[in-house]
Curated annotation (Swiss-Prot):
<feature type="binding site">
    <location>
        <begin position="295"/>
        <end position="299"/>
    </location>
    <ligand>
        <name>substrate</name>
    </ligand>
</feature>
<comment type="function">
    <text>Trans-enoyl reductase; part of the gene cluster that mediates the biosynthesis of oxaleimides, cytotoxic compounds containing an unusual disubstituted succinimide moiety. The first step of the pathway is provided by the HR-PKS poxF that serves in a new mode of collaborative biosynthesis with the PKS-NRPS poxE, by providing the olefin containing amino acid substrate via the synthesis of an ACP-bound dec-4-enoate.</text>
</comment>
<feature type="binding site">
    <location>
        <position position="228"/>
    </location>
    <ligand>
        <name>NADP(+)</name>
    </ligand>
</feature>
<dbReference type="GO" id="GO:0000166">
    <property type="term" value="F:nucleotide binding"/>
</dbReference>
<protein>
    <recommendedName>
        <fullName>Trans-enoyl reductase poxP</fullName>
        <ecNumber>1.-.-.-</ecNumber>
    </recommendedName>
</protein>
<dbReference type="GO" id="GO:0016651">
    <property type="term" value="F:oxidoreductase activity, acting on NAD(P)H"/>
</dbReference>
<feature type="binding site">
    <location>
        <begin position="187"/>
        <end position="190"/>
    </location>
    <ligand>
        <name>NADP(+)</name>
    </ligand>
</feature>
<dbReference type="Pfam" id="PF08240">
    <property type="entry name" value="ADH_N"/>
</dbReference>
<feature type="binding site">
    <location>
        <begin position="62"/>
        <end position="65"/>
    </location>
    <ligand>
        <name>NADP(+)</name>
    </ligand>
</feature>
<keyword id="KW-0521">NADP</keyword>
<dbReference type="InterPro" id="IPR036291">
    <property type="entry name" value="NAD(P)-bd_dom_sf"/>
</dbReference>
<feature type="binding site">
    <location>
        <begin position="364"/>
        <end position="365"/>
    </location>
    <ligand>
        <name>NADP(+)</name>
    </ligand>
</feature>
<comment type="pathway">
    <text>Secondary metabolite biosynthesis.</text>
</comment>
<feature type="binding site">
    <location>
        <begin position="210"/>
        <end position="213"/>
    </location>
    <ligand>
        <name>NADP(+)</name>
    </ligand>
</feature>
<feature type="binding site">
    <location>
        <begin position="151"/>
        <end position="158"/>
    </location>
    <ligand>
        <name>substrate</name>
    </ligand>
</feature>
<feature type="binding site">
    <location>
        <begin position="275"/>
        <end position="276"/>
    </location>
    <ligand>
        <name>NADP(+)</name>
    </ligand>
</feature>
<comment type="subunit">
    <text>Monomer.</text>
</comment>
Amino acid sequence: MPVQPCSLPAGFLPAAVSLPSQQTVIAEDETGKATIYHDAPLPIPEPHMVLVKTIAVSINPCDWKMPSRFPAPGARIGCDFAGIVLSIGPEAARIRRDLRIGDRVCGGIHGSNPIDLPSGSFSQYVAAHADLLLKLPNKLSFAQGAVLGGSVFATLWIALYESLGLEGTPDMPLQDDPPPVLVYGGSTSTGTAALQILRLSGYRPIATCSPHNNDLVRAAGAEKVFDYRSETCAADIKSYTNGRLRHVLDIITDLQSQLICYDTFSRVGGKYTCLEQPAEELHLRRTVRKEMIVGLAASGKEIALADGYERTANPQLRARSGEFFQTIQRLVDEGKFVPHPTRTVEGGFEGILKCLDILKSGGTSGEKLVVFLDRENP
């Protein structure tokens, strides 16, 4: 029996191509294991969304950590993607007048979502928030677009500005006596993005990484790089910053990173922002204010996780995040923001499963894994 085409909700601009009713996706099975399914329905986009044909995806640590920690049978996995706009919702057309059917875009969505099972980028088609999309300039490939994605920028808006409370932005950088900001995990994709944004915002970014990634991290904007494996790492950072360090972003958030980050502060203390739940027993210094942020909250929707990762709906945060994406779009268009280095893994959906295993085993350093789901558009 032939597959019946998919129908879009009322008000959507007609799709550029005929849409099937089923697609291939990677979703969680009953135990949370990433599994390939070939008979999944297409997502039904909301009025403020666009429907995107996925060309390439990048793989993040959260793509294996979330199903492992918060299994949600049936939830589709994956956050970051690059693809082609197929249809635009009526509200999306109003808030993004620059978007056109056929545009090359990238973005991020909430994969492994227990209250929105069809949301996940490891799919042939995704429904994405229009105001959290970036248009890809011709000089950037789909692989680079998948690495840009959207989850990094959502995370960094919340981390740098909502949590750390930094005042300088790429639109209005600091002019006088810029303070240092430490990025622990500078060679990660989030790290190189943070360093570029900090530099463009007028700060003095410093970072930790493995020595073989020093050139990458310096190129991203770090004025000084420290070896996190050195026994004197924290002392070296404290000495270099002359006790002026007040803002630390810990991208790694393991026991070692937390110990080092806390020891970089002087007695005056400061703000420590991390991306995973920190160890409570470490946080005995009252002068250091800690906060664990969840980048997914930039969508403005409820984050129905647990163990401190849950968040209530926050439309105002969504609006501020959307404004930040406009800033990032300008930087990308002007060539002022450089995507993280890519490593393409072949195999389509099977390649994604391979990448998840690579990340679990710690098999990447200074690069982002990318898989193409449509090789006709490399």
